[in-house]
Design a protein with these regions (language model features):
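Conserved mixed alpha/beta catalytic, RNA-binding, or beta-rich assembly cores of soluble enzyme
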Residues: 182-219, 223-224, 240
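Short, solvent-exposed amphipathic alpha-helical segments in soluble enzyme
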Residues: 70-75, 174, 196-199, 241-248, ...
Length: 306
């Protein structure tokens, strides 16, 4: 049995804060990050009020530091229009749904070639992806549907296979009909090691998700928000291409807000999320901090000021 470094019992709880967070936010200086944090909160609140998209790009660490319950609560409150995942985020969420645990010890597993070789993750994710491809679905919807079907098949049984559905973004978004897109790099994700991995299915489903994502990005015009949280390479590159596709097809895409949240400000998020897409009109915001502190603080501010 593979050992995991993260358990669902360690996950964050949705904010149930009373008065206090708003006062804290109001007390922040109107300088640098204090000003930027307020701007991010204001942009998200404004987008929801206008009915504009609030798209959350999520890297793997956001899931494995226990923030799914916070994001699911924001889904329920209308602050998440779509979830945009890289491959790692999808893997961690899939494992949490099934086992309530994720994040293996790479140092211990790699010497014997056991890293990324968990049978259940590899087999079931690839089955879900192949089924999605056969039905003309994207990867995000396909993974959510697969997990939800497992929930239904094993409902009421002592050996239910999806014991942690409440902590899964894939399942909760699927149930709420909130789009999830998954953007992978072939060979970068552990399920690609498995004998059931089908490059055509992986590429086909992720490509459909890119098309869906581009259609969502188109709607950011005039008031939408795109947040990149914890993806340093894949999602910033995908977002930049989606922006270019939308504009190439003649659609207006200006006066929207982008937010990058990470514990370091890397080159690609800084350029491809914060700066370049908003050069022709819009606002790019960079917030630096640990996900497990910064994202719950942002969520609490949204809830209290809603």
């Amino acid at each position: 049995e593979r050992q995991a470094k993260v358990q669902a019992s360690q996950f964050a709880l949705p904010s149930r804060t009373g008065p206090g967070v708003g006062a804290l936010i109001d007390s922040l200086p109107q300088i640098l990050a204090g000003k930027s944090f307020r701007a991010a909160v204001g942009a998200i609140l404004s987008a929801r009020k206008k009915g504009k998209p609030i798209l959350w790009g999520l890297g793997g660490h956001v899931i494995k530091v226990g923030l799914s319950p916070v994001l699911i609560d924001l889904m329920e409150r209308g602050f998440v229009t779509a979830a945009v995942l890289n491959g790692a985020a999808a893997i961690h969420d899939f494992e949490i749904a099934l086992a309530g645990a994720t994040s293996e010890d790479v140092d211990a597993a790699l010497p014997e070639g056991q890293f990324g070789m968990a049978e259940e993750t590899g087999a079931w994710m690839n089955q879900a992806i192949s089924s999605a491809d056969g039905n003309g679905l994207g990867m995000g919807e396909g993974l959510g549907r697969f997990l939800e079907n497992l929930c239904q098949e094993t409902a009421g049984t002592a050996s239910g296979k999806v014991a942690f559905a409440d902590a899964s973004l894939l399942i909760q978004a699927y149930r709420r009909k909130i789009p999830v897109t998954v953007h992978v790099a072939i060979g970068a994700d552990t399920p690609h090691n498995h004998p059931l991995a089908d490059g055509r299915a992986i590429g086909g489903t992720s490509f459909r998700d890119f098309s869906l994502f581009a259609s969502l990005v188109r709607e950011l015009n005039s008031g939408g928000v795109y947040l990149n949280v914890g993806s340093a390479v894949i999602l910033p590159e995908v977002f930049l291409k989606a922006v270019s596709v939308v504009r190439n097809l003649g659609h207006p895409l200006r006066e929207f807000t982008t937010v990058n949240m990470d514990f370091l400000q890397h080159y690609r998020p800084s350029e491809n999320v914060v700066r370049r897409p908003t050069l022709d009109g819009g606002h790019g915001i960079a917030l630096t901090g640990h996900h497990e502190i910064l994202l719950p603080l942002l969520a609490a501010a949204l809830i209290e000021q809603d």
